[in-house]
């Protein structure tokens, strides 16, 4: 688990093999993720799935951003299909209790890191397990099984986006 807090002016385009959780603590920050650009505001949480090309840029507001990167090879030992999962947070419903739970978990992880008390590394890993359990239960839109993307019907949130992604991936697997 790698946690960074930063005031972002610009972070060049890159990708990594980890899942990255971006939590805007203050202000706003621009995020380019693939072909899409977003402005994330205070309280917003964005999940960058592994190998997604992304970059950050400043807006007209100063910002403070927490970025938590989870090592997929480590956590896949505990969550078998984690490497094949795709997560989406829908920030349109700010009162969503699942988003509030994510904010709380991320806050506890940050406090454990700042406190650096005895055994804090284990607390951070435990908090990350809680974070992953929440993501898998409430924000997992796809998983890959037998070489095909499967839409997780139990999910809530942006069903339009999930449906669109499901149709696109089904088309790709059927035609290529």
Where are these regions (language model features)?
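A short, Lys/Arg-enriched amphipathic alpha-helix from helix-turn-helix/homeodomain DNA-binding modules
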Residues: 100-103, 148-176
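N-terminal regulatory/effector-sensing and dimerization cores
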Residues: 2-87, 115-122
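Short, solvent-exposed loop/helix junctions and linker helices
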Residues: 15, 96-99, 125, 158-162
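Linker/hinge segments immediately adjacent to helix-turn-helix/homeobox DNA-binding domains
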Residues: 132-154
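A general structural signal marking secondary-structure boundaries and capping sites
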Residues: 28, 50, 113-117, 135, ...
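Amphipathic alpha-helical segments enriched in hydrophobic/aromatic residues interleaved with Lys/Arg
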Residues: 83-138, 169-170
């Amino acid at each position: 688990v790698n946690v960074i807090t930063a005031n972002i002016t610009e972070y060049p385009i890159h990708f990594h093999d980890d899942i990255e959780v971006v939590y805007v603590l203050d202000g706003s920050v621009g995020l380019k993720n693939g072909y899409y650009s977003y402005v994330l505001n205070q309280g917003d949480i964005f999940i960058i799935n592994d190998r997604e090309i992304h970059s950050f840029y400043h807006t007209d507001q100063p910002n403070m951003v927490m970025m938590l990167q989870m090592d997929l090879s480590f956590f896949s030992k505990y969550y078998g299909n984690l490497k094949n999962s795709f997560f989406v947070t829908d920030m349109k419903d700010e009162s969503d209790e699942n988003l509030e739970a994510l904010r709380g978990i991320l806050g506890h992880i940050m406090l454990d890191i700042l406190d650096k008390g005895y055994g804090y590394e284990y607390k951070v890993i435990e908090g990350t397990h809680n974070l992953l359990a929440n993501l898998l239960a409430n924000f997992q839109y796809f998983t890959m099984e037998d070489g095909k993307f499967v839409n997780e019907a139990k999910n809530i949130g942006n069903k339009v986006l999930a449906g669109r992604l499901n149709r696109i991936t089904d088309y790709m697997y059927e035609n290529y």
